[in-house]
Amino acid sequence: MPEPTMPDDLVRLWRLRNGPRLGRPAELDIDRVVDTAVRLADEGGLVAATLPKIAAALSVTPMSLYRHIGSKEELIGLMADAAMGPAPDCSSEATAEPNAHHATGGTATRGDATESASPAWRPALREWAVAQSEVFRRRPWLAQLPVTGPPRGPNAIAWMDAGLRALRETGLDWAAKIGVITVVGGYVRQAFTLDRQLAESRGAANVDERQALRRYVRELTAVVDAGRFPDVTALLGSGLFESVPDAPESADQDFAFGLDLVLDGVAAAVER
């Protein structure tokens, strides 16, 4: 029975050869196309990485790009894998010390106390999550890309392997491990997306986080009925929104708190 043919897009994603190369190397190749696309996206977001703009940056025609990337959809997958970069070393040996401070800019959080006495998987999985968050901060456009299936590219597979390696000693079965890294990765992506959208909204309104929250309290206090919404009324009158730290610190604290909640859920699954 003949072996199945490997899909062309997978060949390109893994930079595999379909036979020997003859003659001089081509002036344009898949790496140049993808590197240029990533650079343009880094500089101006996804709108800056269209095929015409990539072609212009490479001094070629847009149609010539299709010999190297297959389709616009395939280019997105190639960009995503390249932009994620190498995975971190999330083995228990590499994360023997608590790593919560990475997620909070050095600010102590509840994670600092819990990590010091936690099993090896917890700081390792935390480091994996924090590393993903740092990638999104460097390349916000990555969080805008659609999720079309499980990891396929070499970098994406390396990240998946690192997440699974963090959970190696937990005793969880494979389905549970995949579930854990999917939930943790989903939290990282959603937390970043929410924070960025709120920041963009405040920027459009020309207000900072403190001003936005004070306006929120003022406006909602005027319309929320205590009899109908007693707990929201109590929240609005608690003064919580009057003591918001600077935006970067606030976002870091929110991320660390949410990640702790997710990791607590993982711990409960591990201990069952």
Which residues does each PLM region occupy?
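Basic, helix-initiating cap at the start of DNA-binding domains
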Residues: 1-53, 57, 70-74, 107
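C-terminal peripheral helix-coil segments that are non-catalytic and often amphipathic
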Residues: 1-17, 197-272
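Alpha-helical structural segments
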Residues: 32-39, 43, 74-90, 123-131, ...
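Short hydrophobic/aromatic patch on the recognition helix
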Residues: 59-69
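Hydrophobic recognition helices of helix-based DNA-binding modules
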Residues: 79, 83, 87, 188-192, ...
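Hydrophobic alpha-helical connector segments
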Residues: 90-158, 174-177, 181-184
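A contiguous pocket-lining binding segment that forms or flanks enzyme active sites
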Residues: 162-211, 215-219
